[in-house]
A protein has these predicted regions:
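A short N-terminal helical cap/helix-turn-helix that marks the beginning
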Residues: 2-10, 30-52, 75
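Acyl-group handling in specialized metabolite and lipid biosynthesis
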Residues: 23-30, 59-64
């Protein structure tokens, strides 16, 4: 599936005759995993596509691509695995408002 239509696996969109979005709803399966189904998939299909731009109070920008996020997501997953956290375990994360945690 190509990038322009991949998101349709997870959303319903309805547009009017002028191309203006009229309705939008989210759909996802019970086994939906944002890191795998979105970040890793986009990281695989278009690794250089911009996913996130962080701007600090001084106006400095930090850009992250889907490829960057996929690598960071895998690092986090491996860290959790190393701590003995398994699929299905419940965890709570308290994160600062910083791009490294988004």
């Amino acid at each position: 599936m190509d990038i322009p239509s991949y998101h349709l696996n997870f959303v319903n969109e309805e547009y009017d005759e002028n191309g203006i979005l009229k309705k939008f709803s989210i759909k996802y399966p019970d086994n939906f995993n944002f890191a795998y189904d979105i970040i890793d998939k986009y990281g695989e299909m278009e690794p250089d596509r911009r996913a996130l731009m962080w701007v600090d109070l001084q106006g400095n920008e930090k850009l992250l691509t889907y490829g960057d996020l996929s690598k960071l997501s895998n690092r986090a997953a491996n860290m959790f695995r190393g701590w003995g956290i398994k699929k299905g375990d419940k965890v709570m994360l308290v994160l600062k408002r910083n791009y490294q945690y988004w």
